[in-house]
């Protein structure tokens, strides 16, 4: 995005928006808001950094708060997977403070480097945005790539020395809750975060086709997935009932309760293919397999 595309220093952001609207009537409202932001800021690195960090905080805490209310008010208690382990407000608050500190000390510096990195690899910030179809298929690819990275790196983090040095912090809560999705050591945040940010960057480096707006939509969906997977609630309308290969809260809750298996983030296929599922069905299948081998 060329921040000097429109006249400089129009006054307020909304005055800049009006100017953009006059010169770019073909753009939709979101595209005009986007263009006005970069033009008004007059500093693309600062514009991207502020927008990225604010978006992350609003989405993360905005999505976590409903789960806090559900836990605190006892709503949907019948759907709580480990209903004897309801997190207290104190636990939620302590978790929130830890996560917020991590956001400012670990994630914020990386976010400020995002725009220079995006420019280096050719990510676009211009308008108009890509088509909905383009964003959909790219985000679907990112879900698959991130899930693959997450499975193998997460499984590696359960190796004894790495677990004790890095991953143990995340398993402080054996009954997870939404806010705890990013409750992790700085090293783990960077390792697993690579799947969310690094995979799309690599995609762009290989194809030369990726818009930062697509990245934002992807990150929002990934945050929703991570928070919901840690929510600790299994509903009749949970997504995996309609997409059997989707992981969901029931899949990840067992991982926190048993400290083993179910290493994937979004999908179930890696755990199934590599026999690391930890579900009643998988355990039964393993027992039957052992009995069959003994009988032979």
From Swiss-Prot:
GO molecular function: C-4 methylsterol oxidase activity; iron ion binding
Keyword RNA-binding: no
Enzyme class at the top of the EC tree: oxidoreductase
Main localization category: endoplasmic reticulum
Spans traversing the lipid bilayer: 50-70, 98-118, 125-145, 201-221
This enzyme's EC code(s): 1.14.18.-
One term under GO cellular component: endoplasmic reticulum membrane
GO biological process: ergosterol biosynthetic process
Subcellular location: Endoplasmic reticulum membrane
Residue positions of motif Histidine box-2: 167-171
UniProt note: phenotype after gene disruption: Leads to the accumulation of 4-methyl fecosterol and 4,4-dimethyl fecosterol.
Chain ranges of the Fatty acid hydroxylase domain: 140-276
Pathway terms, separated by semicolons: Steroid metabolism; ergosterol biosynthesis
Cofactor (UniProt): Fe cation
Motif Histidine box-3 in this chain: 251-257
Span of the annotated motif Histidine box-1: 154-158
Membrane topology: Multi-pass membrane protein
Pfam family, one: FA_hydroxylase
Induction: Expression is controlled by the transcriptional regulator srbA.
Record keywords, A-Z: Endoplasmic reticulum, Lipid biosynthesis, Lipid metabolism, Membrane, Oxidoreductase, Steroid biosynthesis, Steroid metabolism, Sterol biosynthesis, Sterol metabolism, Transmembrane, Transmembrane helix
Annotated function: Sterol-C4-methyl oxidase; part of the third module of ergosterol biosynthesis pathway that includes the late steps of the pathway. The third module or late pathway involves the ergosterol synthesis itself through consecutive reactions that mainly occur in the endoplasmic reticulum (ER) membrane.
Family in the record: Belongs to the sterol desaturase family.
Additional free-text comment from the UniProt record: In Aspergillus, the biosynthesis pathway of the sterol precursors leading to the prevalent sterol ergosterol differs from yeast. The ring system of lanosterol in S.cerevisiae is firstly demethylised in three enzymatic steps leading to the intermediate zymosterol and secondly a methyl group is added to zymosterol by the sterol 24-C-methyltransferase to form fecosterol. In Aspergillus, lanosterol is firstly transmethylated by the sterol 24-C-methyltransferase leading to the intermediate eburicol and secondly demethylated in three steps to form fecosterol.
Protein name: Methylsterol monooxygenase erg25B
Taxonomic source organism: Aspergillus fumigatus (strain ATCC MYA-4609 / CBS 101355 / FGSC A1100 / Af293) (Neosartorya fumigata)
Chain's gene name: erg25B
């Amino acid at each position: 995005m060329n921040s000097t595309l429109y006249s400089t220093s129009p006054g307020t952001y909304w005055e800049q928006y009006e100017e953009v609207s006059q010169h770019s009537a073909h753009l939709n409202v979101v595209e005009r808001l986007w263009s006005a932001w970069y033009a008004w800021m007059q500093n693309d690195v600062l514009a991207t950094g502020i927008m990225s960090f604010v978006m992350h905080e609003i989405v993360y805490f905005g999505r976590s708060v409903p789960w806090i209310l559900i836990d605190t008010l006892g709503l949907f208690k019948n759907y709580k997977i480990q209903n004897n382990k309801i997190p207290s407000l104190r636990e939620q608050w302590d978790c929130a403070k830890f996560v917020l500190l991590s956001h400012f000390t670990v994630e914020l510096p990386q976010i400020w480097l995002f725009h220079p990195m995006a420019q280096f690899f050719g990510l676009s910030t211009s308008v108009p945005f890509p088509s909905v179809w383009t964003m959909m298929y790219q985000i679907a690819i990112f879900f698959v790539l991130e899930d693959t990275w997450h499975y193998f790196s997460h499984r590696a983090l359960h190796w004894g020395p790495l677990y004790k040095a890095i991953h143990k912090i995340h398993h402080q809560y054996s009954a997870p809750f939404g806010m705890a999705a990013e409750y992790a050591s700085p090293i783990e945040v960077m390792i697993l975060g690579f799947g969310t940010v690094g995979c799309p960057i690599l995609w762009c480096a290989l194809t030369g086709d990726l818009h930062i707006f697509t990245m934002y939509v992807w990150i929002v969906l990934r945050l929703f997935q991570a928070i919901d997977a840690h929510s600790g609630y299994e509903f009749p309308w949970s997504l995996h009932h309609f997409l059997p290969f989707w992981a969901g809260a029931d899949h990840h809750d067992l991982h926190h309760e048993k400290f083993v298996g179910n290493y994937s983030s979004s999908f179930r296929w890696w755990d199934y293919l590599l026999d690391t599922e930890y579900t009643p069905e998988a355990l039964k299948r393993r027992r039957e397999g052992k009995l069959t081998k003994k009988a032979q």
